[in-house]
């Protein structure tokens, strides 16, 4: 018994420093370095001054095309790191913004979040940068935003790419119960490095974990450790409400541009699934079926699947994902 107690005490002692070492970042990710120069777009929206952080990378040998990378709910412009390098080296200009409410961008006390508003913000940034036409790539929640952007600005979207997008189903219609913004807020205040890592390991990486994933856990957890954690949690709650209440799946048939779907079939993401009855949970996040359904609904879609990958294939298996991505982009030429 004493040996068991000693081992348990040792495990606790080893775990404690890891918890204590979670850094405290500012509400706009002050203190966390993406490893890329970050610029800021200052503009006014909904009677408030805002700043949108973004990365703008120019290639040494440009091929004349621009790609816009739209991050997911638990991701930032910086998590596109390997994708940024790959596309730059292939000749693309690459622009990766942090949306309002996320990461290094403004987190307002009050904001009427909608995918339309985020698309308009992104379009304003591209206008400021002189980009008249782009290929839009969205991952996770960024896939819903990319869809909305393409629907609103079809003539300026030469190609649409979605990497494990959420929103391939309507969770509300399938039986996921509504949660108030206040409930989401209380839930988000409990966010920790441990909860993030557990969720990401199960959902993003199909049960696997590599040391390089820890950087992205630290990035997210650090915002919930700092002095502005309430503002971070509040904006996160508002964004979850947007995601739940604003489906895009019913408009897939209106997409006019060539669309590439890159799907890790081990993904099981479905926001709010844990609050749904067990019989409903079983029907959600079936990405093998959802990917096929989306490809059938979108007029000019190409579907590429990865049977062993989860929600973040560009991080889990970057070489494989990026080969499929570059092949899909080259097919437009």
What positions do the PLM features span?
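Catalytic active-site module of serine/aspartate enzymes centered on a nucleophile-bearing elbow/loop
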Residues: 288-333
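Conserved alpha/beta-hydrolase catalytic His-Asp/Glu region
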Residues: 191-253
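N-terminal signal peptide c-region/cleavage motif recognized by signal peptidases
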Residues: 15-17
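Active-site loop/oxyanion-hole signature of alpha/beta-hydrolase fold enzymes
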Residues: 44-48, 55-61, 99-137, 141
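Conserved serine/cysteine hydrolase catalytic core
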Residues: 225-296
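Flexible "cap/lid" loop of the alpha/beta hydrolase fold
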Residues: 147, 151, 158-191
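Conserved HGGG/HGGXW glycine-rich cap/lid loop of the alpha/beta-hydrolase fold
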Residues: 46, 50-104
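N-terminal cap/lid segment of alpha/beta-hydrolase-fold proteins
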Residues: 27-57
């Amino acid at each position: 018994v004493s040996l068991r107690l000693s081992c348990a005490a040792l495990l606790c002692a080893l775990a404690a420093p890891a918890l204590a070492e979670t850094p405290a970042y500012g509400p706009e990710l002050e203190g966390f370095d993406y490893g890329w120069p970050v610029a800021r777009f200052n503009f006014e929206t909904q009677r408030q001054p805002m700043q949108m952080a973004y990365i703008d990378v120019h290639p040494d040998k440009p091929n004349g095309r621009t790609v816009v990378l739209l991050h997911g709910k638990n991701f930032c412009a910086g998590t596109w790191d390997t994708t940024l390098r790959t596309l730059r080296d292939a000749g693309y200009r690459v622009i990766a913004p942090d949306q309002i409410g996320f990461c290094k961008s403004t987190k307002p006390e009050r904001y009427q979040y909608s995918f339309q508003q985020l698309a308009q913000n992104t379009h304003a940034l591209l206008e400021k940068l002189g980009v008249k036409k782009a290929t839009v790539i969205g991952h996770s929640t960024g896939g819903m935003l990319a869809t909305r952007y393409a629907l609103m600005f079809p003539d300026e979207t030469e190609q649409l790419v979605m990497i494990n997008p959420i929103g391939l189903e309507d969770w509300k219609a399938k039986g996921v119960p509504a949660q108030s913004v206040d409930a989401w807020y209380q839930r988000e205040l409990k966010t920790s490095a441990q909860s993030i890592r557990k969720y990401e390991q199960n959902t993003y990486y199909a049960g696997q974990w590599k040391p390089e994933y820890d950087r992205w856990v630290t990035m997210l957890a650090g915002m919930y450790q700092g002095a502005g954690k309430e503002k971070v949690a509040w904006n996160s709650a508002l964004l979850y409400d947007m995601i739940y209440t604003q489906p895009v799946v019913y408009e897939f048939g209106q997409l006019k541009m060539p669309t590439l779907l890159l799907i890790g079939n081990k993904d099981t993401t479905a926001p709010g699934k844990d609050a749904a009855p067990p019989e409903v949970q079983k029907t959600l996040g079936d990405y093998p079926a959802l990917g096929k359904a989306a490809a059938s609904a979108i007029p000019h879609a190409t579907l590429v699947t990865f049977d062993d990958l989860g929600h973040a294939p560009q991080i889990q298996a970057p070489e494989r994902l990026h080969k499929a991505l570059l092949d899909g982009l080259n097919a437009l030429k």
